[in-house]
């Protein structure tokens, strides 16, 4: 399905490029935006699935418990890079924060503090971009928990 949506988007962009004065320009533009929204939603659902799988490793005997969280982070970040003005930016951003938080909590001791710091960075990025977010209470709870793991002494 994604290949079909991407092909349709390319065809509509081609139409806009070769027929910029067409009477159907506005229709083509709105169709492009609609297709982009569908692609973003599909990728969001993929990212959310990875997040929901969390530390589940299935039948894999080699699997790291954090692969699903990492996949959720990478998928959501790629969507934000490709479609920076998406309507789902807040949902993708909170998903990244949640996944980084859970990945950090489940990390081995050697990596935990660094990953907690990455989570704090993501917290500040989220808070700056969405100061009035409906997720702000959850974000503050994550920050409070993460702060416990980060050493503050500069020795």
List each language-model region with its residue ranges:
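Acidic, polar-rich low-complexity tracts and alpha-helical solenoid repeat scaffolds
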Residues: 1-155
